[in-house]
Structure formats: C-alpha cells, structure tokens
Amino acid sequence: MKQLEEFEKKLGYSFEDKKLLKEALTHKSYKSPVNNERLEFLGDAVLDLVVGEYLFKKFPKANEGELSKLRASLVNEEGFAKLAQKLDIGKYIFISQAEENNQGRTKPSLLSNAFEAVMGAIYLEKGLEKVRELSLKLLEEAYPKIDLDSLFKDFKTALQEFTQAHYGITPTYKLLGSSGPDHKKEFEVAVLLHEETISTAKGRSKKAAQQEAAKEALKILKARNE
C-alpha cells in the first residue's frame, strides 16, 4: 500500500509484516477487527525503558528524583505527539469519519498513541535495539538541547528544591504589574530570595510569568553556586 510505504520512508524502517504496521496505525474508531491499543500498551513500556536508560547514561550525576522528572517531561502525551508530528503520523492513521470530522488527525492523544503503537510494533519485529535507534534519533531532533534545565516543565518546583538545598529557604513571587488590553494582558513577576530580587519575567498569565521568572532565577543561582 503506497500510503504505508510513504510512512516507512519517513520512519526509516521497512516492516516485514505490513499488517503489523497497519494495526499500529489503526485507531479504535476505525471499522476494523484490530486496533492499535495493544501495541500502544507495549510501546509505552518499551519507550519508558529506552528513554529511562538514555537519561541514566546521559546524566550520570543526576539523582533518582531528577531522572524521574526528566523522563516524565519526555514520556508523556505531549512529548510523544511531538515525535509523531516529526513523522507526520496524522496523515497515515486510520480513523473513523466521525473522528475525521473532529480533527482526529491532529489530536495529541491520537498521535501519541499511534507513535507508541508503531514503536511497539517495531519492538515485536526487530527488538529493543531498533526501537532505541529510531526513537532516540527522533528525540534528539525534537529536543536539540536535552539537559536538566531545559526539560524541567515545572521550574517553580525545581527552583524551590534548589533554594531549599542551598539556602534553606523558599523563594517568593511578587507581581510587579500588568499591561495591555484584557484579551492580550501581560503580567510581570519577580522572584525574591531574602528580599533580594533574583529575576523578573513577563508572561500571558501570572503562572506563565512565574515559571519564566523561576527558570531565569534557577540559571542565575546555579551560576552563583558553581
């Protein structure tokens, strides 16, 4: 089937069993005796191991908590949907007309599940090494800078842990002001430590501004403690 061959080229892997590939790309809404849920289950477990091992080797000084946070920031729906988009999986999945009408081809959940299923199918056919090779190549393309700072989604938590460990206190956040019309309001927030302003940042919401300010504060404080 031409459509599947086109996908295999993007993936960089040609399946020996084309039925297995079609199963991996078949959503449960599609009228078919099989769907990709079982392969998704397998792929999820395999990717958990592959990414966990990758981070374990890449960050030899990271502790268990840091490694868990790093993995959680990559092994999730949003992360796998990003890898699926690199392969344009949405173009090749088999979905029902109702799902088609509901923008199913761009839904992060469908893309993520299909990506996991494809990796599960590759694992069945070629084993762990092939999954490792293909998934890590995609991962490094999607995340050119994989490090402890850039992967932590929750910078406020990371900053709090850092300041408690190094200074014995928790940072505080101060709203400096807001600007712009209601539909495009921007907030400015400062991070303070011992009444000292460490960083300031702006965001479209108070939470976004706090995260951005925490990210900057973390960089500044880490540089001070080097």
Curated annotation (Swiss-Prot):
Reaction(s) catalysed (UniProt annotation): Endonucleolytic cleavage to 5'-phosphomonoester
PROSITE patterns xref list: DS_RBD, RNASE_3_1, RNASE_3_2
Enzyme Commission code(s) on record: 3.1.26.3
Binding site for Mg(2+): E40, N113, E116
InterPro entries for the chain: dsRBD_dom (IPR014720), RNase_III (IPR011907), RNase_III_dom (IPR000999), RNase_III_sf (IPR036389)
Residue span(s) of domain RNase III: 4-127
DRBM domain: residues covered: 154-223
SMART domains associated with the record: DSRM, RIBOc
Major site of localization recorded for this protein: cytoplasm
Record's GO cellular component terms: cytoplasm
Cofactor: Mg(2+)
Domain of life: Bacteria
Compartments, as annotated in UniProt: Cytoplasm
GO molecular function: double-stranded RNA binding; metal ion binding; ribonuclease III activity; rRNA binding
Alphabetical list of CDD domains matching this protein: DSRM_RNAse_III_family, RIBOc
GO biological process, any: regulation of gene expression
EC class of the enzyme, as a word: hydrolase
Keywords associated with the record: Cytoplasm, Endonuclease, Hydrolase, Magnesium, Metal-binding, mRNA processing, Nuclease, RNA-binding, rRNA processing, rRNA-binding, tRNA processing
Enzyme active site: D44, E116
NCBIfam families on file: RNaseIII
Family stated for the protein in its record: Belongs to the ribonuclease III family.
Subunit structure: Homodimer.
Function: Digests double-stranded RNA. Involved in the processing of primary rRNA transcript to yield the immediate precursors to the large and small rRNAs (23S and 16S). Processes some mRNAs, and tRNAs when they are encoded in the rRNA operon. Processes pre-crRNA and tracrRNA of type II CRISPR loci if present in the organism.
Protein name: Ribonuclease 3
Organism (species): Nitratiruptor sp. (strain SB155-2)
Classification of source organism: Bacteria, Pseudomonadati, Campylobacterota, Epsilonproteobacteria, Nautiliales
